[in-house]
Amino acid sequence: MKKKCIAMLLAGGQGSRLRSLTTNIAKPAVPFGGKYRIIDFTLSNCTNSGIDTVGVLTQYQPLLLHSYIGIGSAWDLDRRNGGVTVLPPYSVSSGVKWYEGTANAVYQNINYIEQYNPDYVLVLSGDHIYKMDYQHMLDYHIAKQADVTISVIEVPWEEASRFGIMNTNEEMEIVEFAEKPAEPKSNLASMGIYIFNWPLLKQYLQIDNANPHSSHDFGKDVIPMLLREKKRLFAYPFEGYWKDVGTVKSLWEANMDLLDENNELDLFDRSWRIYSVNPNQPPQYISPEAEVSDSLVNEGCVVEGTVERSVLFQGVRIGKGAVVKESVIMPGAAVSEGAYVERAIVTPDSVIPPHSSVCPEDADDVVLVTAEWLKQSNEETARKDEA
């Protein structure tokens, strides 16, 4: 059945800058915000925007992500016609060919796209935190009679060299694109969200695939090629909350942003819900002795200590006399009796030992607490005790 617009969601990235958080799971599956995973935001945006056909392209450590997405029920994407389809690399007569770049991942799934014969293809990244109505962007794309529309956001000039930067004319038509320029001419950064006219995208994916010198990436190869060919590329200005949670510090910051009273993301907005898989946990329990302030405390938590400006995921336990400040405690983790935790991300199922202390040496830094970190910390404590 023909679709006006379908989405291709790139979710195969490793996210190596998140260190141990992505050792066994893909970056889009990393927990966020007390009950979500990062990919929930993009999938929820699709549902809320009326995009009912989504191909999710996976590659790195896909097991948990595949299980989590399932048939898409949590996001109302369990449709007979369309819905969500997980698209890992697959074997053909010449063998298994891994995805070699963002553009190549979409190219290898041309047959999936063709079965819906769409007019437009929305290409998304599954590893950013934001709310966006893609229908507004599509209307803009059509009104501009564009071949390609790229969503952009203004970033501080001092940070512009970290992004793909668009230089536009007064009509917002893109006249120049530079990937991480040393001397940026603009502060309009690409958000990694593209709308293509499908016939044109198909043509240029085939051209790019035939080029042995290409890295097969949208930002590095396909977009510059379209600019050289004088195609109509427009920038779509986005003004809401958007966060690239590619580092431990930025992931912590995004979680802390949720605790601001007037935060732009607003998880409690009934008009734009962020959907997730229900963890099926019992209600939270906060003991009479506990003190909790400015925090998100999810289902299944047991809090007997002090929690200030922190995010607790499902199944977290905070022991008696324990203190947790400005921290993210991920699913199943525990802070034992009398322990102190500040400015930390505690990974799933980790246990902070009784009466221990976790805080960064640099006041502006963030500690990532993993099983390996705890092992090293315990060994150092034992050596000090022996001395």
UniProtKB/Swiss-Prot annotation:
Transmembrane parts of this sequence: none
The record lists alpha-D-glucose 1-phosphate as bound by Y99, G164, E179, K180, S190
Q: Per UniProt, what is one Pfam family of this protein? A: NTP_transferase
Question: Which GO molecular function entries does the Swiss-Prot or TrEMBL record give?
Answer: ATP binding; glucose-1-phosphate adenylyltransferase activity
Which pathway, per its entry? Glycan biosynthesis; glycogen biosynthesis
The cross-references to HAMAP family, in alphabetical order and at most eight, read: GlgC
What PANTHER family does its record include?
Answer: GLUCOSE-1-PHOSPHATE ADENYLYLTRANSFERASE, GLUCOSE-1-PHOSPHATE ADENYLYLTRANSFERASE-RELATED
Quote the protein name from its UniProt record: Glucose-1-phosphate adenylyltransferase
Corresponding gene? Answer: glgC
